[in-house]
Amino acid sequence: MDATELGVSGEGEEIDMEVMRPLIESEDRFEGTYGEKKHLQRYLNSDNKKDEEVMKPLIENEDDSDGTCDEHQYLQRHPDLDNKDGLTFFQTLIHLLKGNIGTGLLGLPLAMKNAGVLLGPISLLFFGIISIHCMNILVRCSHFLCQRYKKANLGYSDTVGLALEVGPGVLQRHASFGRNLVDWFLVVTQLGFCSVYFVFLAENIKQVFEVFLETKLQQSEIGIWSLDLRIYMFSFLPLIIPLVFIRDLKNLSLLSFFANVSMAISLLIVYQYVIRNLSDPRTLPLGTSWKTYPLFFGTAIFAFEGIGVVLPLENRMRDKKDFSKALNIGMAIVTTLYISLATLGYFCFGDQIKGSITLNLPQDSWLYQLVKILYSFGIYVTYAIQYYVPAEIILPAVTSRVQKTRKLLCEFTMRFFLVCLTCAVAVLIPRLDLVISFVGAVSSSTLALILPPLVEIITYHKENLSPWVIMKDVGIAVIGFVGFIAGTYVTIEEMIYPISYVPPNVSHSDFGVLNNTVLEGH
């Protein structure tokens, strides 16, 4: 609000602005120009709950379907009121586990192959510790900015934007860019997840269906045939499209509950199989070449990229002072789960490990075929939840540019386009390991490793950070950046020249013939 909007004459503008200054300034001390303060106050008055609303589907309670928790009332409630109906410690812990366990977990045994039986577990532990530390950094920076500028809560992109806004002068004018950058990487990450789901569903259901078909055809003495993997991807498109038109995800709460149960049962069955069928780890390499390690990095960071749900969870927790404990316990469990399944899976299947460990399970047992069906059901339902995030970021920006009478048509068109886009990416890169590694290297490394330490340096730039903290933050950001560059380069090279991918039962000498028809090996 300026002086002219208040009906003040130009001559008295300076006096009136002095009078009105308390209405537009923060009560806390802020060292900067008056113009900077006005710009900051406009930023603070923006809708900083957008991140929480966008990421909300990833942290919803499964018991919301009973009507005991009205989400709309929660979101409309004044943010400064008591969070009496917030998440308990146990609920927060469960949501942290749910937000970090998905297809990335099943791809870690193959990632272990790209790192080695010794270097792999050590690297996973290292990346796990760094990821947890970066999550805590983001939470601390959010708390600092909230307390200093009297905000109830902040999301990821708002935290980055406000940190830039109150940072050094050269960065202040880039606050909007910082927020948009985080939103863009969130969109890339979530749509990347959705593309991974297409490949995962196609590979697992293809295997189940063709084993079933093979059994029937052998009984009738008819020749065995195999469909291209891309046919299965396209066949899932009409099944997934209806999911993305569901606006209120509470309608999926019951399905989401059964999906989580299905995935948990599947993991238990996978664990018991690999533990009972361990091979001698001394036959496996301790380490691998630098050319395959970036693929490991991308997959590992993809698996650990749960930082997008951290602040929304903390904002909805009933007793926020316990969040750090829940975060550390939850991520410690996740890290243990990752290292154990990755190591045991690689010990069990060795060099024959595939993009998803479920694809290595025996095909002649109904129990292990059921594992693929159950986990695929869980991933199918999860698609709608992951898709919600980029849709809520992209759709408002697009529909705001069209006439009101065409907004609904525009929204439906964009929803249809985005789901087709994720399918197209899966068709173009029909290898589960490469899609996971590419998404991890490009966007997950930025969100999980690069931005949090830089945000800490900017947020506390006036608080006399110790040289050790600055060196630590710069070191983490450099690791993330090197992984970003190397992982992206090696993954793209592998897409063009897939020399490290050898389908099962195919020798390296014969693989040159199949290099251009890799789909037939799935």
UniProtKB/Swiss-Prot annotation:
It is found in: Lysosome membrane. GO terms for biological process: amino acid transmembrane transport; L-alanine transport. Signal peptide: none annotated. It holds the Pfam family Aa_trans. GO terms for molecular function: L-alanine transmembrane transporter activity; L-proline transmembrane transporter activity; symporter activity. The keyword Chaperone does not apply. GO terms for cellular component: lysosomal membrane; vacuolar membrane. It comes from the Eukaryota. The chain crosses the membrane at residues 115-135, 181-201, 226-246, 255-275, 293-313, 329-349, 377-397, 409-429, 435-455, 467-487. Keywords: Amino-acid transport, Glycoprotein, Lysosome, Membrane, Symport, Transmembrane, Transmembrane helix, Transport. It catalyses: L-tryptophan(in) = L-tryptophan(out); L-alanine(in) = L-alanine(out); L-proline(in) = L-proline(out). It is a multi-pass membrane protein. InterPro entries: AA_transpt_TM (IPR013057). Glycans are attached at residue 515. Belongs to the amino acid/polyamine transporter 2 family. Uniporter that mediates the transport of neutral amino acids like L-tryptophan, proline and alanine. The transport activity is sodium ions-independent, electroneutral and therefore functions via facilitated diffusion. This is Neutral amino acid uniporter 4. The lineage of its organism: Eukaryota, Metazoa, Chordata, Craniata, Vertebrata.
